[in-house]
Amino acid sequence: RVCQIGLFSLTLPMAVHAQSLPVIAQHPIKNVIKNLEQPTTQQTQQKTKQNKSIAQMRIMHIDLDYVFDTDKAQQQRNIQALIQRIQNIRPNTIFLQAFADPDANGSADQVYFENCYMPVRDNLFQQVLQQIRQNTQVQHVYAWLPVLAWELPKDQQLNYVQHRQGGQKGYIRLSPFEQKNLDIIVDIYRDFIQHNPVDGVLYHDDVTLSDYEDSSALAHKYYQQWGFSHRIFKDLRHPEQARLAKYKTAYLDQLAAGITQVLKQYKPNLLVARNMYAPVVPQPQSEQWFAQSMPSTYRYYDYNAIMAMPYMEQSKDHKKFYLDLIQHAKKYDPNLDRTIFELQTVN
């Protein structure tokens, strides 16, 4: 059953068990999964080798927007240059972008794989995946995909995350409280996994809601179901804000866990990682601003990919920034077996 505490049987540090994580009993992702057709034996990738975790992951995070070109001869040259770089750097793991973000706003305008909902910029993911498999030493390839940040064609007339001050701020994200949106998101993932035999999925850093979000009417209905009064929505300093944030975190992470459950129907040994904002690691109170937390992350994902980017966080002391992240991450993952630090190579 999705969204139950027993969804993943992981051995977690005491620091994780010590905190009570809410469970969203009536999560709509349950209905989405219940109504899905089960994959046939042919669709399930049974013959794929079992994914064994890599003791020391050496990762390249690749943005296909820089490989894509309308000139297909140039695009092939770009692919070959990428493969050569992978051969030179010798990573054992690749995080490979599967969505297109040409306007660089963090949301998917198009994708690099065939599907029924999003415009296809080019079926580039499959090409690059095949080249990596055939011509490099890489052991695992993860598809980097959004959970909420899908900008679908406007004629779909979908509901998006609303900011309390009006309109949309940050990434353009489908409201996670709308059943129709969840149906679409799951269908996009099903279209992807049936034709792209990846080892894992990296969930984008769009799995987040600020303390001003989601302010849509449907979101407010959920907040009331969780036991929060209208007063809390008008006062960001309300003492219940921290508890509301925990519920939003639980809702988002259990949504991602539901998607993972669907993917594993096709790829039983799939591994999943999530991008986490760095302030959440040393400052648990940041959960109110991001709806992300360390305990919930290690509950619902195989890996926590922390965006350890001091320039983005405007940190003056980069060494201290990194050491603080390591120290605090060890409170939840003592051996850092399930923690990834994504480093910023340029400002």
List where the protein language model places each region.
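Boundary/entry segment of secreted carbohydrate-active catalytic domains
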Residues: 24, 28-39, 47-78, 346
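Active-site-adjacent "subsite" loops/lids of carbohydrate-active enzymes
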Residues: 53-76, 140-191, 195, 238
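Active-site clefts of carbohydrate-active enzymes
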Residues: 62, 273-280, 329-347
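Catalytic domains of carbohydrate-active enzymes, especially glycoside hydrolases
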Residues: 77-103, 195-200, 297-304
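Alpha-helical scaffolding within the catalytic cores
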Residues: 81, 282-296, 318-331
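Aromatic-lined substrate-binding rim segments of carbohydrate-active enzymes
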Residues: 82-83, 100-146, 240, 244-266
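Polysaccharide-binding and catalytic clefts of secreted carbohydrate-active enzymes
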Residues: 85, 167-300, 306-312
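Glycine-rich, aromatic-flanked loop segments that form ligand/cofactor-binding clefts
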Residues: 93-95, 124-167, 202-208
